[in-house]
């Protein structure tokens, strides 16, 4: 999962908050209008509470845009003076943000949108997802696959998140960059951007659809008519100027720094004092609920009589008191020791070897474990006590020191505790140390207890221990002033580092006592904990990528794109802009008349989305070519051109990271990069898999893929005998289903009938409806309903199973996999039918998908252990849900194939046999 950065446009939210209360302004007892402050803070806390961002900052205008004013002296000249209440609010908002430890980004001579635009692009380049929090539509020009507009809720409406699709629909453009042309054409009265005379929103959309850009419009005014042509020809310079003024700058001298923008704990006392001064009682409660979910707020005192004092304004705005103050290092007794001498280190090692369970945590130089160097290691085996072992900078000396502690780390009798242990294991592997012994990872344990909550240590500490850990920023600072941990005084590093191990140790005690209560102990011990080492090994191994092949394939796709464009133009009888929905719609629906009743957008333009065009692809080759053109464009940019950038310079391989604590069903997720979504459905997409190759000519790739595992699981769990019998006879389950549903002999089932049966078979897991089936096939809705009814009549136990699962979820609030993994479903009792329906579908799907995830994890652990036990050179490289990919020496192939097949097919015993299909090739495509 990518990290997420939220950037707030301060003034846009402040003005919005101020005017939201314009009819009922918030005035405190001192006569101060606090509407702007309150509105802004509500928006900020809503984002933090709802989205739980990893990184966040607030951008302010400072002195206006010098560049735009130099370009156009009257830029924003007609804006009214800022209301006094807003001017007075700004210092308070600055003060609150500083107390919250939220970065304030401003630059003299630049506007907030330029700052946010620059930071967004920088963060996107660092593999972040960026959310621009603002109601200002101008930001739509910045939207991309990883940059989104986040429009806060207003007037009872929910928040809106605009991605590429939403921008395309709302502005009727092909590319978000065309929003600049749209804004330039129609102008902006608020900012005094002139635009083109006589061009409003509707006309701007039409012109953009016809011409694609401001420049193309101005170069082809001869195609316009009447007054519009005259207006535009006489104001071409205004058009160019307006587009320049509307363009958000991307070169502001600001820098996105990961550490500087990271969310951290606020100064609760400072925030409380400011809110007390402003008389923000309710906002304080909101603040505490956002940052301290376990805090208890005490109501203000009542008058002696038990009645509220009529004349006491203090009761309305009184500062609530925290009954349970947060603990921290300064108010909690602790004893942390430094082991920085040979004698201290020897004594520490002796103590470690006497323990049965120890928590440890590494301090390093890099978040990428493959490139990280040790700065120090902290140890704890009793609450509020611990040790810090600092490491020298020189690799040789550091290796010598870690060698001294190898007997502890590789002692199988001593259990190791940590938070995100996989990272620590990989760091120690850099020094040749293989951690042994049972593993207890608090992050994974908490995921099993509460999969929908965040699992980082600071949040867990605040929630379960009522303790605020030392912020890393207090040691090394943020942004440009950030220093290396090696330069921090050793006593300060000791306090910070050992506290991490201490907190993790205490969390272990909390979670260890809770896990048996929710049936989580066994699945942790037998599955998730052993999997840590398996995933660490896979991540460290990486996979070989044929970069040269992808570069050549990129050229092939360029040629395909050009060929498709030529073919489309020939079929249309003219050249036109494929990126223009207006021109495309006119060609398809007016000139070629592919539909007698074409759908239109709200503005009257022809709809040309994939959903609209897909039904015409079979009958009209031009439509098929257009859809293919779009697919090729996306394939090239998302995979073919992007994957080579992910190759590690030191290893020459691509290293993904597998996350155990993301998907609620228990599935693994892959990121940086995501190797679980490599295309497979189309011939062109399949070529991307061809780029994943064996280590060298002496190796091959082995793919092992479970055959229809989810259908086998649902057949077994539902005890549906007809389906079980088909699997036992090793029949093609989709052909068998078609024979039963359509009442024809097995050998007479048509390809179309099998296809419909396959759609229903897989759709049943996700609660397919007649409407959904109709959309996926050529069946009418009534035919789809009849097919589903016949399906359930053929497999009656499936319907019973689905009903039982939903009833179980209603009664218990969760469902379980075959290993007891729970998926909690709080929305199962929702009064909203749509929300409740989603929970009901999850009640059916989660045990099936989760059980499949459990089974392949069992297989992965067994295979990993057997490869090690037999000292084979084969390595497991990838897990893509139901498929495993291995790098196998050709000399080991006949040993490994039966080993893998047996481990996968015997991972779990069901009423239906598990089947793993194996394939071998020099690349992933050939092996699959």
Residue ranges, per PLM feature:
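Short hydrophobic beta-strand that contains or immediately precedes a catalytic carboxylate
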Residues: 7-8, 134, 358-360, 439-440, ...
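C-terminal polymerase-core module
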Residues: 559-566, 570-624, 793-845, 891-928
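Short alpha-helix plus adjacent loop in nuclease-associated cores
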Residues: 74-88, 144-173, 229-230, 387-405, ...
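Conserved "right-hand" nucleotidyltransferase catalytic core of DNA-directed polymerases
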Residues: 235-392, 410, 419, 452, ...
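Conserved catalytic core of nucleic-acid polymerases
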Residues: 483-486, 490, 533, 540, ...
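Extended two-metal-dependent nuclease catalytic cores across DNA- and RNA-processing enzymes
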Residues: 2-3, 23-27, 77-253, 462-464
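Conserved RNase H-like, two-metal-ion catalytic cores of nucleic-acid enzymes
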Residues: 6, 16-51, 55-57, 73-74, ...
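Extended, highly charged clamp/arch subdomains and adjacent linkers
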Residues: 1-60, 64-76, 88-95, 236, ...
């Amino acid at each position: 999962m990518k990290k997420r950065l939220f950037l707030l446009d301060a003034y846009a939210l402040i003005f919005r908050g101020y005017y939201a209360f314009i009819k009922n302004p918030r005035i405190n007892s001192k006569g101060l209008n606090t509407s702007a402050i309150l509105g802004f803070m509500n928006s900020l806390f809503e984002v933090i509470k709802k989205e739980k961002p990893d990184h966040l900052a607030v951008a302010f205008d400072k002195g206006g845009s010098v560049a735009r004013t130099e370009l156009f002296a009257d830029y924003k000249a007609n804006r009214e003076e800022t209301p006094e209440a807003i001017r007075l609010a700004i210092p308070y908002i600055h003060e609150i943000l500083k107390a919250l430890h939220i970065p304030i980004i401003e630059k003299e001579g630049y506007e907030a949108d330029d700052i946010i635009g620059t930071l967004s692009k920088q963060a996107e380049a660092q593999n972040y997802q960026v959310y621009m929090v603002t109601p200002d539509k101008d930001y739509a020009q910045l939207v991309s696959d990883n940059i989104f507009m986040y429009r806060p809720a207003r007037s009872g409406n929910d928040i809106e998140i605009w991605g590429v699709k939403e921008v395309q629909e709302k502005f009727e453009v092909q590319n978000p960059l065309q929003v600049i042309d749209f804004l330039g054409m129609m102008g902006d009265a608020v900012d005094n951007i002139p635009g083109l005379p006589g061009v409003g929103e509707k006309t701007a959309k039409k012109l953009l659809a016809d011409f694609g850009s401001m420049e193309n419009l101005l170069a082809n005014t001869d195609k316009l008519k009447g007054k519009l042509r005259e207006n535009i020809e006489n104001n071409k310079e205004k058009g160019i100027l307006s587009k320049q003024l509307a363009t958000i700058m991307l070169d502001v001298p600001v820098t996105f720094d990961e550490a500087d923008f990271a969310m951290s704990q606020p100064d609760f006392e400072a925030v409380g004092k400011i809110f007390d001064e402003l008389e923000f009682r309710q906002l304080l409660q909101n603040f505490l609920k956002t940052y301290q979910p376990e805090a208890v707020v005490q109501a203000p005192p009542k008058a002696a009589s038990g009645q509220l004092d009529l004349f006491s304004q203090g009761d309305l705005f009184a500062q609530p008191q925290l009954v349970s103050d947060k603990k921290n290092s300064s108010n909690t007794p602790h004893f942390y020791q430094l082991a920085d001498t040979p004698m201290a280190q020897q004594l520490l090692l002796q103590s470690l070897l006497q323990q049965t369970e120890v928590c440890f945590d590494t301090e390093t130089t890099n978040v990428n474990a493959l490139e990280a160097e040790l700065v120090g290691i902290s140890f704890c085996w009793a609450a509020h006590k611990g040790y810090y072992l600092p490491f020298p900078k020189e690799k040789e000396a550091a290796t010598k020191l870690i060698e001294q502690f190898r007997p502890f780390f590789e002692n199988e009798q001593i259990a190791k505790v940590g938070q995100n242990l996989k990272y620590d294991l990989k760091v120690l592997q850099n020094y040749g140390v293989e951690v042994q012994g049972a593993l207890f990872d608090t992050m994974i344990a908490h995921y099993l207890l509460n999969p929908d909550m965040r699992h980082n240590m600071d949040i867990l500490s605040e929630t379960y221990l009522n303790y605020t850990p030392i912020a890393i920023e207090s040691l090394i600072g943020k942004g440009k002033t950030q220093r290396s941990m090696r330069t921090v005084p050793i006593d300060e590093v000791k306090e910070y580092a050992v506290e991490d191990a201490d907190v993790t140790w205490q969390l272990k005690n909390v979670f260890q006592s809770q896990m048996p209560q929710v049936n989580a102990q066994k699945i942790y011990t037998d599955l998730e904990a052993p999997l840590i080492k398996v995933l660490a090994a896979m991540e460290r191994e990486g996979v070989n990528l044929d970069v040269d092949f992808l570069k050549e394939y990129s050229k092939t796709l360029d040629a395909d794109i050009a060929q498709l464009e030529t073919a489309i133009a020939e079929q249309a009888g003219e050249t036109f802009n494929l990126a223009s929905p207006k021109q495309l719609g006119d060609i398809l629906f007016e000139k070629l008349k592919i539909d007698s009743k074409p759908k239109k957008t709200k503005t009257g333009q022809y709809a040309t989305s994939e959903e609209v065009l897909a039904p015409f692809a079979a009958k009209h080759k031009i439509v098929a070519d257009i859809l293919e053109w779009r697919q090729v464009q996306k394939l090239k940019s998302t995979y073919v051109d992007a994957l080579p950038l992910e190759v590690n310079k030191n290893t020459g391989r691509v290293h993904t990271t597998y996350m155990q604590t993301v998907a609620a069903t228990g599935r693994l997720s892959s990121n940086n990069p995501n190797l679980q979504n490599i295309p497979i459905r189309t011939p062109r997409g399949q070529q991307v898999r061809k780029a994943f190759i064996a280590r060298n000519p002496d190796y091959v790739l082995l793919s092992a893929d479970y055959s229809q595992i989810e259908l086998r699981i649902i057949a077994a769990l539902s005890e549906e005998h007809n389906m079980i019998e088909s699997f036992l006879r090793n029949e093609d389950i989709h052909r068998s289903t078609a024979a039963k549903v359509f009442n024809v002999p097995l050998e007479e089932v048509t390809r179309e009938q099998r296809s419909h049966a396959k759609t229903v078979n897989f759709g049943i897991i996700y609660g397919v409806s007649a409407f959904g089936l109709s959309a996926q096939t050529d069946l009418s809705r009534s035919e789809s309903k009849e097919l589903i009814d016949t399906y359930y009549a053929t497999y009656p136990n499936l319907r019973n199973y689905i009903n039982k699962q939903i009833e179980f979820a209603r009664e218990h609030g969760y469902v379980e996999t075959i290993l007891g993994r729970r998926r909690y479903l709080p929305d199962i009792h929702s009064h909203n039918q749509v929300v409740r329906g989603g929970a009901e579908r999850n009640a059916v799907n989660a045990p099936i998908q989760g059980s499949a995830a459990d089974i392949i994890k069992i297989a992965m652990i067994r295979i990993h252990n057997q490869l090690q036990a037999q000292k084979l050179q084969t390595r497991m490289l990838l897990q893509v849900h139901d498929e495993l990919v291995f790098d196998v020496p050709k000399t080991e192939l006949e040993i490994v194939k039966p080993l893998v097949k047996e481990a996968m097919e015997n991972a779990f015993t069901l009423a239906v046999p598990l089947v793993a299909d194996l394939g071998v090739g020099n690349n992933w495509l050939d092996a699959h």
